[in-house]
Amino acid sequence: MLALALAAVLAQAPTPSTPSKKDAYLAAKQDAHTRRPARATQRADRPIWARNLRTHEIRALTGPSGLAEGAAGQAGRSAFFRCWFTHGEGPIPAALVAVIVAAAEHFEVREVQIISGFRHPKYNLLLTKKGREVATKSQHPLGNAIDFLLPEVEARELYEWLLGTHDGGVGFYPISEFVHIDLARKRTWRGT
C-alpha cells in the first residue's frame, strides 16, 4: 500500500523537463538582462545634463547639442555658466567642462548641478567684502573655475576622485557639499 501511495505521488510530480515557475522566471530575467544594450551605447544615447542652480537653466553637456562638444561651443558654455548676479559672460574652456563630464561618467550619474561658473570681477569683489570664502586671486573671474556637485554622490567621494584625476585646483566644501575645480596649478584646499 505504501508503494501505491508513493507511485501516485511520483506520478503527480512535475517531470524534470517541465521548468518550475521560479526557473522560468529566472530564465526570462536572464534573457532580458542579456538583451540590454552595452553601457557605451547607453552613454551615447543618454546625454549628461547640467542644471544651473542659480539661473534654473538646464542644458545637455554631452551629445550633438551639448556644451562639452558639438554645436553649442564656446558661446553656449559662456551663456550657461554666466555670472548669475551681473549676467556677465566669460570664456569657459571645454577642458573644464570635460572634467565635469568625466566625473559624471565615472559615478554613472546623468545630472550635474552647477553652483558657480564664471563670476564677474565686481561680484567677486562684493563677495570678498562680505567676508565670504572667496580667494583674492579667484579663477572664477577668469572663467577657469566651476563649483558643482553630483546628486547622490558624496562630495568627499567626488573630491577624492578629482584629486586623483584632475591636474588643476580642487577645493572641497564639506558643509556646503560641493567641490570646486579650476585650471590653475595643481593644489587643494578645504572650505566650509
Residue ranges of model-derived segments:
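A mature extracytoplasmic/lumenal domain signature
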Residues: N52-R54, G63-S65, S116-F118, L150-E152, ...
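Active-site acidic/histidine clusters and adjacent loop/turn architecture
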Residues: T62-Q113
